[in-house]
């Protein structure tokens, strides 16, 4: 073995971290970055800089490099690709040895991949487009507390998507009035109701009073309908200790499901709560508040497909996924891609959906995607087609905005859903024939008829900001 020597000074990153001859190992963690360099900076140099600054490198050589096997531990920029339709940036593919990351710690992975490197001056912008977690690393993560099949067994609901509703107005209701709205929605035919992401424990409605009134409403609706019901009680709190206190109380009063804002709450808190839910038989609903700050800019940040993978590994039984057809951002093909990431055991590379790597989740349970945001009964045929059975279709204003009240809004959604599922099971092209399916169903449901009349002109026809790269469409 050749003796190591130390040569002080600064050398180009590409001398150490640009390795186009490298063949990634099955155990490597692979990352695809969309890199927008400063003018005049060579692609190979800036790709190598990303690999260096997200792994072992710093701005100068250091003598302590001699005390380790730097060639083993370093990140390696091994491939560069053009971004179709955009000559201001390029894709840089980086391989990291698995030993760089603490087992089961999404916190540690993100600290490296999206840490200081995102402030590097040689970059105008940087976006983490996708990550391939090796199966050896996946197996160190807890994943969803229960998964889709266990949830169906707990809730005793099969053969269709689940129906939910976010209680509105999201802020300002007293606990008793909040519970009343929950009861009316569940009695009307929904499976779940939900706290909104910013409902925690404010002066107008403290968490414990909300939990009590909501659970009373849930149990009353269960008795009257003979169906299992639930409400996502948001336990997101200022401290982990307070979060667990709220979770314990939810369990004590008999709630089947709690909720966490995983990005604002953080991955450390989320992984801990997922572990607690697994141990205590509680389902865990995950809201993605703050995601658009990270993922909406097509040149800088973290793509939602990465945040989806991280959540599946960290733990959650539900995750908000966008709707494609509602009021929130969401390219159809990209959304189908991260729905697959949530639910499937193995996801093949598919550039048409923005998926840059194969991803193997082994036997890890799937996460149920939640379609929520500006949807109503006219969207039901498209939602059933896009999301399939293993999903939650969540209508907030599309339930509570019904002219006849909350229970009627819930009934309209339930009738619309069951009509679409029945038609699909008969082989009808539901999305194509949606209008006729709903019109026929409305002949025996005045609630649905009024809902269709109320929202027939409501559309959210804005262009998607974060589109898939054009040549992959």
Swiss-Prot record:
EC number: 4.1.1.39
InterPro entries according to UniProt: RuBisCO, RuBisCo_large_chain_AS, RuBisCO_lsu_C, RuBisCO_lsu_C_sf, RuBisCO_lsu_fd_N, RuBisCO_lsu_N_sf, RuBisCO_lsuI
Catalytic activity line of the entry: 2 (2R)-3-phosphoglycerate + 2 H(+) = D-ribulose 1,5-bisphosphate + CO2 + H2O; D-ribulose 1,5-bisphosphate + O2 = 2-phosphoglycolate + (2R)-3-phosphoglycerate + 2 H(+)
Cofactor field: Mg(2+)
CC cofactor note: Binds 1 Mg(2+) ion per subunit.
Top enzyme category: lyase
Active site location: 168, 287
PROSITE patterns linked: RUBISCO_LARGE (PS00157)
Modified residues (N6-carboxylysine): 194
PANTHER family: RIBULOSE BISPHOSPHATE CARBOXYLASE (PTHR42704), RIBULOSE BISPHOSPHATE CARBOXYLASE LARGE CHAIN (PTHR42704:SF17)
The protein's name: Ribulose bisphosphate carboxylase large chain
